[in-house]
């Protein structure tokens, strides 16, 4: 049984109904429909915290999906799971791969910045201010890109850039 059929969440059910209607009326190939079904089931599993199941669905969606734009969102969601699991190196890899296919994902830039900022904080706790500054500088670059794509968003990041004199 498709995961979306067993999910009890109202929003997920609504999304599934709308997605199923769209799949019927929009001309798509069977492969595209199957890829979307895996993607939808991956999102459902991810929203419930079932990351292993979500990853399986996303990997299947990646195998079937050919559109670079759609692939970027699959890769982004895989990055989110790795971030949630504390696998920051893997997460950064998937965010990079998502941005290669779709450079207009401010949320990927933001998440990369958050990881870099976190690593900077870790370096400070370990007494390595030089490494910390390098991580903070990288975080600043990613936040600048996120802010450039969506002015008015990421207010806390914008304030951090101003306070740390990294905003030009």
Swiss-Prot record:
Gene: ycf3
Keyword set includes Disulfide bond: no
Keyword set includes Iron: no
UniProt protein name: Photosystem I assembly protein Ycf3
Entry's Gene Ontology BP terms: photosynthesis
Keywords: Chloroplast, Membrane, Photosynthesis, Plastid, Repeat, Thylakoid, TPR repeat
Membrane topology reported for the UniProt record: Peripheral membrane protein
Principal localisation: plastid
NCBIfam families: PRK02603.1
Species whose genome carries this gene: Helianthus annuus (Common sunflower)
InterPro entries registered for this protein in UniProt: PSI_Ycf3_assembly, TPR-like_helical_dom_sf, TPR_rpt, Ycf3/AcsC/BcsC/TPR_MFPF
GO cellular component, one term: chloroplast thylakoid membrane
TPR repeat segments: 35-68, 72-105, 120-153
Subcellular localization: Plastid, Chloroplast thylakoid membrane
Role played: Essential for the assembly of the photosystem I (PSI) complex. May act as a chaperone-like factor to guide the assembly of the PSI subunits.
Family label: Belongs to the Ycf3 family.
């Amino acid at each position: 049984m498709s995961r979306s059929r067993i999910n009890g969440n109202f929003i997920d059910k609504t999304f599934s109904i709308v997605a199923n209607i769209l799949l019927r009326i929009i001309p798509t190939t069977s492969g595209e429909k199957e890829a979307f079904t895996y993607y939808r089931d991956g999102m459902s599993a991810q929203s419930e915290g079932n990351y292993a199941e979500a990853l399986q669905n996303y990997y299947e969606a990646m195998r079937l999906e050919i559109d670079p734009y759609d692939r970027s969102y699959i890769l982004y969601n895989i990055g989110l799971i790795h971030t949630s699991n504390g696998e920051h190196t893997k997460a950064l890899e998937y965010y990079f791969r998502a941005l290669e296919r779709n450079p207009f994902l401010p949320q990927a830039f933001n998440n990369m910045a958050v990881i870099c900022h976190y690593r900077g904080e870790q370096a400070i706790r370990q007494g390595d201010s030089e490494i910390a500054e390098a991580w903070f500088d990288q975080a600043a670059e990613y936040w600048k890109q996120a802010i450039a794509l969506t002015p008015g968003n990421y207010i806390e990041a914008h304030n951090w850039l101003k306070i740390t004199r990294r905003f030009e």
